[in-house]
Structures are given as structure tokens and as C-alpha cells.
């Protein structure tokens, strides 16, 4: 069995977990998440803990660790939530909230409007910062990657959209 799967997931107070065959639903203060778990993994809820183990006779131990990590992210998401911060670096690079999307000015001849999926909220503390929040870790990371993909940071001047904790590797300009 994988090392990750050996540790049970603790269910904090205020979080309700229901298991229906291979579908697990986690409800908490920030919302509700549902996921279908791989059939090669058996999930048991007991004593305010969730335990994942490979199903009997199946050799896919790695799936148990993956299922445990996904369930842990669901529990943390509905209890605390996840956030991802993006920073815009460059002259004239700006962001603002526009309805259910983010209006981005990234040096193109036209402004970009990125529509946010259900479950993700955004706020702009300043014109060059975006904070994405959600209960779903995968979804908030996907939206952040899509926004970063419009103008990834380039290595010579460092301009572009970057994660707040990202270190951009800089290159030296060509010498004459």
C-alpha cells in the first residue's frame, strides 16, 4: 500500500462526509464537493476518519494514495478553501473584475475577458494582482493556469502573468 494511503483523513467538526458506493460527497461551511472514486480503491468512513485501501486482490496500490489525496483536498476545500494569487508584471498590464469574469489588458491589441467557471470567485486587490478562491483545488489551479497561459512570464524582462510565489529564471541579453 502507498505511504500516502496509510494515513487516514481526519474529518474536522462541521464537515459531513457521505459515501454511496464509489461516490463520496463532502459538505462543509464553504460548500459541497462530490467525486467518483476509482473502483480499485475501497473507502471506509468511521470514527471521524476516512480510510483508503486498495480493493481486495487488486495490485493498484498507487490508486489508493491518489484517492486519499483527492479526498483530503475535498475536506480541506469545504472547510478552509483554496486560493491562488497571480501577479501581472509589465507596463500597462492590468486586471479588473467584469461581471462573472476577469477583464485583462496584457499588451494585445484587444482586451481579454476570461470567464470564471461556477465555484471560482476572483478579486483584484490592485490592478496588477488577482486572487482566485474556490473549494475545489483542481479547479482554482486550472483557472490560474489558463490566465497565466495568456501571457506567461518571459525570461529576458520578466514581463507577463506569474503566480505570486513563482521565481522567474532570468536570462542575460545577447552581447554585441
Swiss-Prot record:
GO MF: rRNA binding; structural constituent of ribosome
Kindly give the HAMAP family that the UniProt entry links to this protein: Ribosomal_uL6_B
Organism, as annotated: Shewanella loihica (strain ATCC BAA-1088 / PV-4)
UniProt KW rRNA-binding keyword: yes
What the record says about family reads: Belongs to the universal ribosomal protein uL6 family.
Q: Which Gene3D superfamilies match?
A: Ribosomal protein L6, alpha-beta domain
What is a single Pfam family found in this protein's UniProt entry? Ribosomal_L6
- Segment Disordered: which positions? 151-176
GO BP annotation list: cytoplasmic translation
The gene behind this protein is rplF
Q: What is this protein called?
A: Large ribosomal subunit protein uL6
Assembly and oligomerization: Part of the 50S ribosomal subunit.
Looking at the UniProt entry, the stretches that span the membrane are none
Q: Please note every region of biased composition (Basic and acidic residues).
A: 151-170
Functional summary from the UniProt entry? This protein binds to the 23S rRNA, and is important in its secondary structure. It is located near the subunit interface in the base of the L7/L12 stalk, and near the tRNA binding site of the peptidyltransferase center.
Fetch the PROSITE patterns from UniProt: RIBOSOMAL_L6_1
Q: Report keywords, A-Z.
A: Ribonucleoprotein, Ribosomal protein, RNA-binding, rRNA-binding
Amino acid at each position: 500500500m502507498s505511504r500516502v494511503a496509510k494515513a487516514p483523513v481526519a474529518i474536522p467538526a462541521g464537515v459531513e462526509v457521505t459515501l454511496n458506493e464509489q461516490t463520496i460527497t463532502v459538505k462543509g461551511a464553504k460548500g459541497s464537493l462530490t467525486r467518483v472514486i476509482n473502483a480499485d480503491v475501497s473507502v471506509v468512513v468511521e470514527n471521524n476518519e476516512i480510510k483508503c485501501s486498495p480493493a481486495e486482490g487488486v495490485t493498484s496500490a498507487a490508486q489508493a494514495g491518489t484517492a486519499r489525496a483527492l479526498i483530503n483536498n475535498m475536506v480541506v476545500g469545504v472547510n478552509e478553501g483554496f486560493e491562488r494569487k497571480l501577479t501581472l508584471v509589465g507596463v500597462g498590464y492590468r486586471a479588473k473584475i467584469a461581471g462573472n469574469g476577469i477583464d485583462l489588458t496584457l499588451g494585445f491589441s484587444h482586451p481579454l475577458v476570461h470567464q470564471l467557471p461556477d465555484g471560482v470567485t476572483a478579486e483584484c486587490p490592485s490592478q496588477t494582482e488577482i486572487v482566485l478562491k474556490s473549494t475545489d483545488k483542481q479547479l482554482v489551479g486550472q483557472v490560474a493556469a489558463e490566465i497565466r497561459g495568456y501571457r506567461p512570464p518571459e525570461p529576458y524582462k520578466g514581463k507577463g502573468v506569474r503566480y505570486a510565489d513563482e521565481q522567474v529564471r532570468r536570462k542575460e541579453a545577447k552581447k554585441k
